[in-house]
Amino acid sequence: MRRRRRRDGFYPAPDFRHREAEDMAGVFDIDLDQPEDAGSEDELEEGGQLNESMDHGGVGPYELGMEHCEKFEISETSVNRGPEKIRPECFELLRVLGKGGYGKVFQVRKVTGANTGKIFAMKVLKKAMIVRNAKDTAHTKAERNILEEVKHPFIVDLIYAFQTGGKLYLILEYLSGGELFMQLEREGIFMEDTACFYLAEISMALGHLHQKGIIYRDLKPENIMLNHQGHVKLTDFGLCKESIHDGTVTHTFCGTIEYMAPEILMRSGHNRAVDWWSLGALMYDMLTGAPPFTGENRKKTIDKILKCKLNLPPYLTQEARDLLKKLLKRNAASRLGAGPGDAGEVQAHPFFRHINWEELLARKVEPPFKPLLQSEEDVSQFDSKFTRQTPVDSPDDSTLSESANQVFLGFTYVAPSVLESVKEKFSFEPKIRSPRRFIGSPRTPVSPVKFSPGDFWGRGASASTANPQTPVEYPMETSGIEQMDVTTSGEASAPLPIRQPNSGPYKKQAFPMISKRPEHLRMNL
């Protein structure tokens, strides 16, 4: 801005009011651009009066009445709006969803700031319990870091992370469908088309983690949640291993024994192939009612995982049997999914031949089970021994030393999506429960997995877009019949629609109606 020299030869002191006006315009988004006219550059006449020839669009500077103006109270809170400070008081405790050795998981409602009124799950961890063990500290930090890094339709979203003197808080999306474990306990076993849907979504989540250099290592029904629509969400990343890429081996002993790969138990070093063993163990659990290798105690279970032959029930289809044998190979190098194709190798197997992977990733495929929910706060899909407890977050009366707190520096996090509109609206649609719940009707009458008529073996043109590597079709192993103790006899038709069903001389076994799960893996419903 030009300054006119006074008659005494000196220039007047600069006027900063214009700069302040520009700064204020930045706050209120006011357009201060002036017409490009050299004759209107704040020229002052003698006497300090404004030149009346300035163009104001036909309206004089003082001709606007109050009816044209909006009153706005200027205060520190309205002008200097910084990022919202997240603390425990921002959330109202509603229900207890679960408990562990290091803390609790609550259902909460946000009562201040962005997302006011929205329901979340709040995981509260006690610092004093965590710092006792360096491994536990590493697991906690890994979970927070992984949840910040990974965004995927089938992985739980981290919304906030913050801490107080004695506690760590993870605010996660609330998954009202509960644990897949609950559905497995209620049903006993899943039909193959139902298991196929869940395993397909899980395989996509595992593949995404592996692309990020992350091994999940703790795949089990308890860590697989369902959202309100019935889609899968992987949770609990405390046992994940970060920064593991092709060829990298880790030796950490962790995870749930029944779903643990042999190379972890032998401490011989492991890589991402352990997740495909766990997927096979989970698949076996879904289709038979128990993990493939269980014993009376921890030692016997480990012995069976390392030495015992895999027994497959005769009622399984040939595709299911073949996939289980390829996933549950003790030699990790020859295990399906261990090659460069990773998830693409698994997804190319004929067991998944009905899956449209592009639609699955977009969550356009209808899940086989949709939770019956009465409201957004519904907790009916969670264990009642927790939900009936009074939700109380114990006082934060323990503060760690400054040196001990150093390990939790940088824990605080706010998701970039917090200021965006919620992508998915909550809806409640009454739906009849699956007929699989009624004894005597073990077969699902209509497969919920969508596929193109006549396309029984191809993965579709969309498969290559969902997976970076184009998978190759792997031939099934058809030689050899697995041994299994047959306690009952009867006929059970293949639950998965197959154009040319296998007619091998297999001795049929009825679907087990009583869960064979070990006692410590059961849930009292």
Swiss-Prot record:
Alphabetical list of Gene3D superfamilies matching this protein: Phosphorylase Kinase, domain 1, Transferase(Phosphotransferase) domain 1
Annotated signal peptide: none
GO molecular function: ATP binding; identical protein binding; PDZ domain binding; peptide binding; protein kinase activity; protein phosphatase 2A binding; protein serine kinase activity; protein serine/threonine kinase activity
Keywords assigned: Acetylation, Apoptosis, ATP-binding, Cell cycle, Cytoplasm, Kinase, Membrane, Mitochondrion, Mitochondrion outer membrane, Nucleotide-binding, Phosphoprotein, Serine/threonine-protein kinase, Synapse, Synaptosome, Transferase, Translation regulation
Domain AGC-kinase C-terminal: 353-423
N6-acetyllysine, modified sites: K516
Name of a matching Pfam family: Pkinase_C
Tissue distribution of the protein: Brain.
Region (Disordered): 28-54, 380-399, 486-509
InterPro entries: AGC-kinase_C, Kinase-like_dom_sf, Pkinase_C, Prot_kinase_dom, Protein_kinase_ATP_BS, Ribosomal_S6_kinase, Ser/Thr_kinase_AS
Main location: cytoplasm
Effect of D31A: Almost complete loss of activity
Residue ranges, annotated region (Autoinhibitory domain): 424-525
Regions of compositional bias (Acidic residues) in chain numbering: 30-46
Residues with the Phosphothreonine modification: T252, T412, T444
Functional summary from the UniProt entry: Serine/threonine-protein kinase that acts downstream of mTOR signaling in response to growth factors and nutrients to promote cell proliferation, cell growth and cell cycle progression. Regulates protein synthesis through phosphorylation of EIF4B, RPS6 and EEF2K, and contributes to cell survival by repressing the pro-apoptotic function of BAD. Under conditions of nutrient depletion, the inactive form associates with the EIF3 translation initiation complex.
Domain notes: The autoinhibitory domain is believed to block phosphorylation within the AGC-kinase C-terminal domain and the activation loop.
Quaternary structure and partners: Interacts with PPP1R9A/neurabin-1. Interacts with RPTOR. Interacts with IRS1. Interacts with EIF3B and EIF3C. Interacts with POLDIP3. Interacts with TRAF4. Interacts (via N-terminus) with IER5.
Annotated family: Belongs to the protein kinase superfamily. AGC Ser/Thr protein kinase family. S6 kinase subfamily.
Protein name: Ribosomal protein S6 kinase beta-1
Source organism of this protein record: Rattus norvegicus
